[in-house]
Amino acid sequence: MKIWVYAIAKNEEQFCERFMASCAGADGVSVLDTGSTDGTVEQLRELGAHVESREIAPWRFDTARNESLKLVPEDVDVCICLDLDEVLAPGWREALEAAWTPGTTRGRYLYVWSHDANGGDGVTFYADKIHSRHGYHWRCPVHEVLMTDAPEVQRVIPGLRIDHWPDSRKSRASYLPLLELAVREDPDNDRNMHYLGREYMFYRHWGEAVETLMRHLALPTATWDAERAASMRYIARCCEALGDTRSAAHWLVRAAEEAPTQREAPYELTRLYYGMEQWALCRYWAMRTLHITERDNNYMTDPAAWGSGPYDYKAVAEWHLGLYDEALDAARAALALEPDNQRLQNNVDIIRRSNNAQ
């Protein structure tokens, strides 16, 4: 089996060595450089990659991806689309060869999009940018997707993992105009409508965000419960930012009903009522959050909902309500998840003293 990695790059010199080391085992690496002014091109070539330079104007990620795919030799069996800030975990080739049975056209694998402060997994989901050489192309100006007009045979690839270690200083300023372009090109695309609404929220354009996210929810193709619930949560964040906590709570309750197996909406309700010092409601939604024990692997998962936060909020709410035994249990559970957190240790001590004072 001939396996090839292909990528696009611009001014990513700091990632070259790590990127190429993780690609060890590939039959080749092709990179389309789109205008680096640092040493990216030279370093990649020194490390063994085939690199070509080309200006993409006007800039679109799908055009760049399609041009980079053209660099992959025609006789390759399997292509891996990888960015310079991504890392293939050791053993990837063996895992891929074991799972790629005859007739397979596309592979799904664990993608770790973010990491916590200690390097542990943050947001994780299954990605699908491993594909057969022929019959595929990229579409959408940003948040591009891999498309095919032919029948697909997909396989999950156990043991294949890609970690994303981005440069937090890198600008994403091009995303908003490209998302606006994507929606103009295909106004019925629910995925892009959701992304555009989220991007407006990131930019604190609250009114435009709410309007766009409402458009997403109204699209007949917007049926994925997790993504619909995320749009509702983002609407709630906009409402809260505008000082309308009543509407924020309304939309978060709707989100919790839309995706009852997801922790994120009840966790945000917990946080909302904590900020409002409505302790009974804060405790109720913390308990609702903790009742959900199976975590989905989708890109909208919030790691905070699966950390110490739900127990922490529950402990504080119960302390205010005079439920000291329950508060102490919750505070200890929070501390067990973050044993080096001094504030959580202080909370345990405060609640223990309150309990002893009864």
Predicted regions and their residues:
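Catalytic-site signature of metal-activated, phosphate-bearing donor transferases
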Residues: 62-69, 88-211, 215
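A conserved acidic beta->alpha catalytic loop
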Residues: 22, 32-45, 56-57, 83-86
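Short, well-formed alpha-helical segments that are part of the catalytic scaffolds
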Residues: 7-26
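Active-site nucleotide-sugar/metal-binding loop of Leloir-type enzymes
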Residues: 66-78
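Acidic helix N-cap motif at the loop->helix transition within catalytic regions
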Residues: 14-17, 38-47, 91
